[in-house]
């Protein structure tokens, strides 16, 4: 395959154009009065959303050089979404600004390697300042405020706060579709563990990369399944019962996985396999929890229990199992209330007698999963397009809330970044001018979110920015109401983790891009664009 290469200014301008096309599409969604973007998915109804990463994911540009720039910027949104679950638009906007300012410094003669050093240093300093300004989430009102700001809806904020009240901050909250028009909260006994399917070939929904099993049997063991013969007797019984099967085992050989996938694809039976969560004694405890919750017999290797002897009545049952890449959620276990209550008392006793903070934390997590259950937010809407959009907003709000619980909250609306900008411009300096130019590329970009929020709300961004620099601590611009308020008191807050990851990821990709001096792409043959005729 032939390649085309562009150097220097030509390469940079093409990459920048791609960066701008993506960022300019995403940034119109920022803030309480941000707009939506309509995405053609190629099937079904279009998706109307203001979720930065969902928009960035759909953008494919015709020019391969511009497309590279867009894809590099998408990495910022994607990484921020993976780690913090929200803040993708802010991250994209910050990255665009840092890249522009970094390239400008290099074009004016600065050494790109030294500018890169300054960008990375400033990114870390801003991140540290955010942690210093952070305050912990203490009340249900804080949770409601974080969720409301993320989803741009007080109603959604209240539902998420209520869900966290019912299953605790460490509980599991999932988002599902409702058959009605109203969005409701339902709490079901269940648990989630941090292991997903062992192969993507088990997936039934390719768009979300998940698999859902309705009323499946559950096999629980800490043994390794080495051959298909180990579980053949129970597989035959499951096929006769005509029920799906979830296998939770310490490990599963490739040969066994291949056989299970082949039979699933052929429609012989519906099965999903996951590895057991945890390790060592903690793994045994967690598997015992799952067995008690589902009503299964835990086939432990320490007790010399043979997998070939498993009977149908040894399997557990759940109303629903949702298996993703990294997590499995069990909803509506058929374990007896007495057995679950007894197990909860055992764990509570262990917490009281434990002297290790690490052990206490692990035990509390297990207790939350057993006692709290799963809260399901059932999203209702009048149309499919509204349902998809609402579901995305709720998922973002949920992620933002979890991030706030982990690292706390800061004043929102972009005000905290402008405050940090003012502080660091006084203290963060470097004797080498090129490194300092890199530092300034980051610091000067910190005002972009506030500027864009104001512009999207119909105000003059520069005027609002000038006024923000005169404000007292924690004061900022409420773009929804068009007035200056105490952001923390009014509940206009951002999760520290979200803002911190946005700046770290933006400075990381910005630092990489400004050191790029050439771009290489494949030259597509004209024949490649002609679709091949089907063979009959």
Swiss-Prot record:
Q: Which GO terms describe its molecular function?
A: ATP binding; ATP-dependent protein folding chaperone; isomerase activity; unfolded protein binding
Positions annotated to bind ATP: 29-32, 86-90, 413, 494
- Tell me which GO cellular component terms the UniProt record holds: cytoplasm
Recorded superkingdom: Bacteria
Q: What is one GO biological process annotated to this record?
A: protein refolding
Task: Enumerate the subcellular locations listed in this protein's record, separating them with semicolons.
Answer: Cytoplasm
Catalytic reactions on record: ATP + H2O + a folded polypeptide = ADP + phosphate + an unfolded polypeptide
**What Pfam families does this protein's entry cite?**
Cpn60_TCP1
Going by the UniProt record, its keywords in alphabetical order are: ATP-binding, Chaperone, Cytoplasm, Isomerase, Nucleotide-binding
Give the matching InterPro entries. Answer: Cpn60/GroEL, Cpn60/GroEL/TCP-1, GroEL-like_apical_dom_sf, GROEL-like_equatorial_sf, TCP-1-like_intermed_sf
Q: Does the keyword ATP-binding apply?
A: yes
| Cystine crosslinks | none
Q: What's the EC number here? A: 5.6.1.7
* Chain's role: Together with its co-chaperonin GroES, plays an essential role in assisting protein folding. The GroEL-GroES system forms a nano-cage that allows encapsulation of the non-native substrate proteins and provides a physical environment optimized to promote and accelerate protein folding.
**Family, similarity comment:** Belongs to the chaperonin (HSP60) family.
Which NCBIfam families does its entry note? GroEL, PRK00013.1, PRK12849.1, PRK12850.1, PRK12851.1
Fetch the PANTHER family from UniProt: 60 KDA HEAT SHOCK PROTEIN, MITOCHONDRIAL
Q: How does it assemble?
A: Forms a cylinder of 14 subunits composed of two heptameric rings stacked back-to-back. Interacts with the co-chaperonin GroES.
The name this protein goes by in its record:
Chaperonin GroEL
**Source species of the chain:** Acholeplasma laidlawii (strain PG-8A)
The coding gene here is groEL
